[in-house]
Structure formats: C-alpha cells, structure tokens
C-alpha cells in the first residue's frame, strides 16, 4: 500500500538528493519501495503527479514539504519514522518554524532520529520539543586530522584577498579545490576573478536554479572544473570522492565550522591540504580558532608574487552534455558503448557519467574531447540522435 511511512528532512536539495540516492541503493532488493524527493527549486507540477501515485518514503527540504502540507497535497498521518538530517544547519537557515509546523502534522507515536554535527542550545531545545526521552549517540570521527596539512596566511588589506586566493592556487596547484566563502556575492566575485585569470572555476550558492546547480556539481565532481567557490550552506551534502584542497576565503565565524570545512579533504587515507586566508581585521577570529584547536595559529610567509605570472592549472577532463536522459531511457552503458565503439575513444579516456531526467553528462580526457564529440554527434543512443555539446566556461 502506497502511503508515506517515513519522512526525511534535509536542509538543502543537494543533501536531499544524496540521501534519496543512498536510500534507493539500499532498497534495491526490497520489492517496489517508492522513494520520492520533494525540494524547492524544482517544478511543483511533476511533484503533484508523483504524490498522486503514492510513495513510501519522502525526502525533502522543509520549505517545500511545508508548502505541500499547506496545499493539502501531502498526508503525513501514517508516518512512523521521522528523520531530521543536519538539523543544526536547518535551524541556521531559519527553518525552525517550518520544522515545527511539519512535526505537528506527524503522529506523536513515531520514531524520531535527529542528526547534527554540532549540539548548541537550539538543537537541545528542538530535541526537547519533538523527541520523547531520546538516547544520545556520539559518533567518533574516523577522519585522521594528521592527514591534513594546514596552512594559515595573513595579509594586511582586505582588497588583497582575491590576489591571495590566486597565489595559493598557483603555489599548490591542486587538481580539485573547494573554496569556502561567506556570501553569495563573494562566490560569484571569486569565481569570476579566477576565470578572468585562466582558472576553471564555478560558483555554488543557494540562488542557483536546480539545472544550473546540477551542472556545477557534475563538472566539479568529474574533474572538468578544478575550483568550486561555495557558501557553507550550498556545500552541505556535496559528495566529492577525492578533494585535494580546501581554502577558507575567510576564517569561519564558528571554529566548529572550520573543522567541518577542512575535514572534506584528506579522506580515505589520502593526504589533504587546507589553507586559510585572513586579514589583520580577522586576528581575533584566528585567536579564537587557536583556542578551540588548542594551539596557537602560526601564519606563514606568503608565496612569491612571481607565481602569478605562471599559467593556471588546466583540469584533466572535459564535460560533454547530451540532450537526452532518464526519460529517454538513456543509460551510462549506452553512452560508454557509443564512445568506445568502432573508431571511438579508449575506455580509459572516459570518466564519470551522470544521467538526469532530460540530460546526461560524460567526462572525457581533454585530449579525447574532439573525437568523443564527433563520435557522439555522428552516432545514436537508443536508436535516436541527440544534440551533444561541449560545456566550457
């Protein structure tokens, strides 16, 4: 019987999509489990159609879930399991009232799971309101901070910040870098400045439309873009297998946020690099971070400015976009077969393949981009020809 039995609330669309993907993977061997994602930024109509067909598990963001409840298009009357993922970030984003409104629509007799990277007073208060004698489980970190090399660089004037960012990218030349900025405007300014100086860089923030966000994440995760400049909120839920470097464009306002930022690099036994830029006006934050880490922040000599004359790092991969996706029954194997068929490119030159409802993306090595593009344009997928283009910029 199709009824919503479990509800998972996430702060961002990216995290909701990631959670839904993992749930679908886990449910593969359970017959006919339907998992539905309901997030803002996506059209409302298709969500209504999906709800009419029913679902067992709904994963979504508070704003869109609350909207469906207001319009009477979502019934939570039979939910037996409620999950709040990254609850601290949801409250930071101002979703407290939405969360309370949603919880009021869920039966009181239920299992409630609340996950939070931090445990401030706001989370204690939320737990007290929505949970009944909860058990606290503290997960020990399996991430070894010793695998991360931390560097701090101090400069006098704030107007030097963009130049300092380029200087660090020239100095360390990481293949993939996540730059954390505090505001949407800074992400755009940072990415624009880097592109104007030859870097492959994109911005990620909460105001991007869903299609644009998907494309940004595809290009960064498949290594056809080397620098992603993002806000903390937009970066939540990012699932990047191997991240070479994290750069803090500013020292984080909260020391715990700093630790979570740099913990994205140096995973799975690999070495990580974390660089933090701060101006003289941020000295107090550096002091507070040092107290939190239990060590004095020692800043290093800035790299030589002559490095700015060097060419920027070029990503090893290029992304090709195909105007056909899941709705046209296009699968990764179809794309790989079309690329590597007679007179095609070598299989080892093909990277990550991402399939969406109406489009697909495939990464190929830079030196194979032209023959790969020719091969896809001249061939067919599922017996059909699709428009194919190389994504640049």
Question: Can you name each region flagged by the protein language model?
Answer:
Residues 1-393:
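Conserved helicase RecA-like core
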